[in-house]
């Protein structure tokens, strides 16, 4: 069994606890928390299982890493604390652990990552012998392994378009939704998510990886964006009120330009309520979220994935798929050489040993 730590127990971490516990090759050995109120609580409770797992949460990072766990699922956020997340991840890699994480988007495409992100991790790999695989949903499998798999079914391909279409009203991340994405802010507020070069920083690596896998050279990466205001005030269950006249929806594209044309496109359509921008793309079933890949060519191929978890919640379902991809890579990484890995390095593997396995 591969001794595995889950670091962080928020929206991603509680799903990671469940994924590690369900994996037949992994053994949950520790859970690291930042909130003092969670110290001493059982991992089963934090993972919202109906049973205890016999692993108590701790905030003693040094003690956990000193025990030399073989793997760490780093589930703490890197969106609003990238420096701290990078320090945590390099610390775990330096301890010799295989680390998987959805944090730190620049490291999804590590070959082109800024030196300030890449170099500390490479130094930690050299010093401690650990590894890192960073990936998610979108950016993540929704615009790397999935579109590339589908492209292999085509005869000719004109455009690969990856879409995330989501209603954020079910999210429980008010800081990210209000300040990074800008929902509920005045229309003259410039959300960080749409600042020039930020979409490319987050999603450009996915464009580059797809281009590399497809054997094409990019002329450049372009960005487009649009915003819409709410017509009426809306109230969400988890994040409160969003006022009429404030930002209610954004739409942007990150485009990989090949021979002057946008051939690889990542598009996001994000709303805080379905009433905003009804003329923009919506999930095919009218639900609150979907990931879609459209291959324009011969044949035309369209695949939509709608994942749900935690009471039919699609944001939780999306997070669960990211966790599944990461946790499912741990045993492969343990057998591989130490290093930095990306989605093209790591095979998408079947759920060996998990078919029919029940989890409460």
UniProtKB/Swiss-Prot annotation:
Job of this protein: Catalyzes the reversible oxidative deaminations of a broad range of amines, amino alcohols and amino acids. Catalyzes the reversible dehydrogenation of serinol in the presence of NAD(+) to give dihydroxyacetone, ammonium ion and NADH, while NADP(+) shows a slight activity. Is also able to produce 2-amino-1-propanol and aspartate by the reductive amination of the corresponding keto alcohol (hydroxyacetone) and keto acid (oxaloacetate) in the presence of ammonium ions and NADH, and that of acetophenone from phenylethylamine by the oxidative deamination in the presence of NAD(+).
Enzyme class, spelled out: oxidoreductase
The UniProt record lists the keyword Flavoprotein: no
One BP annotation, GO: lysine biosynthetic process via diaminopimelate
Documented EC number(s): 1.4.1.28
One Pfam family cited in the UniProt record for this chain: DAP_DH_C
Entry keywords, A to Z: NAD, NADP, Oxidoreductase
pH-dependent activity: Optimum pH is 10.0 for the oxidative deamination reaction, while the optimum pH of the reductive amination reaction is rather broad and between 6.5 and 7.0.
Lineage: Bacteria, Bacillati, Actinomycetota, Actinomycetes, Kitasatosporales
SUPFAM superfamilies: NAD(P)-binding Rossmann-fold domains (SSF51735)
Activity over temperature: Optimum temperature is 30 degrees Celsius for the deaminating reaction. Is not thermostable.
Assembly, per entry: Homodimer.
MF terms in GO: 4-hydroxy-tetrahydrodipicolinate reductase
Record family assignment: Belongs to the amine dehydrogenase family.
CDD domains with a match to the protein in the record: nat-AmDH_N_like (cd24146)
Top-level taxonomic group: Bacteria
Entry-linked Gene3D superfamilies: NAD(P)-binding Rossmann-like Domain (3.40.50.720)
Record field: catalytic activity: a secondary alkyl amine + NAD(+) + H2O = a ketone + NH4(+) + NADH + H(+); a secondary alkyl amine + NADP(+) + H2O = a ketone + NH4(+) + NADPH + H(+); serinol + NAD(+) + H2O = dihydroxyacetone + NH4(+) + NADH + H(+); serinol + NADP(+) + H2O = dihydroxyacetone + NH4(+) + NADPH + H(+)
Protein name: Amine dehydrogenase
């Amino acid at each position: 069994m591969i001794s595995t730590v889950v670091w962080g127990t928020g929206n991603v971490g509680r799903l990671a606890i469940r994924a590690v516990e369900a994996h037949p090759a992994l053994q949950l050995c520790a859970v690291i928390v930042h909130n003092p109120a969670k110290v001493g609580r059982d991992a089963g409770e934090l993972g919202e299982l109906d049973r205890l797992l016999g692993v108590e949460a701790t905030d003693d990072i040094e003690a956990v890493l000193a025990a030399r766990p073989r793997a760490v699922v780093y589930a703490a956020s890197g969106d609003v604390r990238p420096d701290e997340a990078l320090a945590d991840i390099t610390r775990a890699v330096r301890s010799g652990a295989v680390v998987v994480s959805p944090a730190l988007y620049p490291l999804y495409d590590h070959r082109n990552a800024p030196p300030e992100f890449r170099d500390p991790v490479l130094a930690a790999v050299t010093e401690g012998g650990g590894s890192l695989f960073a990936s998610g949903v979108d950016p993540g499998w929704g615009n790397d392994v999935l579109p590339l798999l589908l492209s292999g079914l085509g005869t000719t391909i004109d455009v690969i378009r990856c879409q995330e279409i989501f209603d954020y009203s079910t999210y429980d991340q008010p800081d990210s939704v209000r300040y990074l994405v800008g929902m509920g802010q005045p229309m003259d507020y410039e959300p960080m998510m749409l600042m020039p070069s930020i979409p490319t920083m987050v999603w450009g690596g996915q464009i580059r990886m797809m281009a590399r896998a497809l054997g094409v050279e990019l002329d450049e990466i372009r960005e487009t964006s649009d915003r819409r205001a709410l017509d009426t005030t809306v109230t969400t269950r988890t994040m409160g009120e969003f006022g009429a006249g404030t930002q209610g929806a954004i739409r942007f594209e990150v485009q990989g330009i090949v021979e002057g044309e946008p051939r690889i496109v990542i598009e996001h359509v994000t709303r805080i309520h379905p009433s905003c921008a009804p003329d923009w793309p919506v999930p095919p079933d009218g639900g609150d979220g979907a990931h879609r890949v459209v291959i324009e060519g011969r044949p035309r191929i369209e695949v939509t994935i709608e994942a749900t978890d935690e009471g039919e919640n699609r944001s939780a379902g999306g997070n669960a798929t990211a966790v599944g991809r990461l946790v499912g890579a741990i045993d492969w990484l343990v057998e591989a050489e130490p290093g930095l890995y990306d989605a093209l390095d790591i095979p998408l593997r079947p759920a060996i040993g998990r078919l029919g396995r029940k989890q409460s």
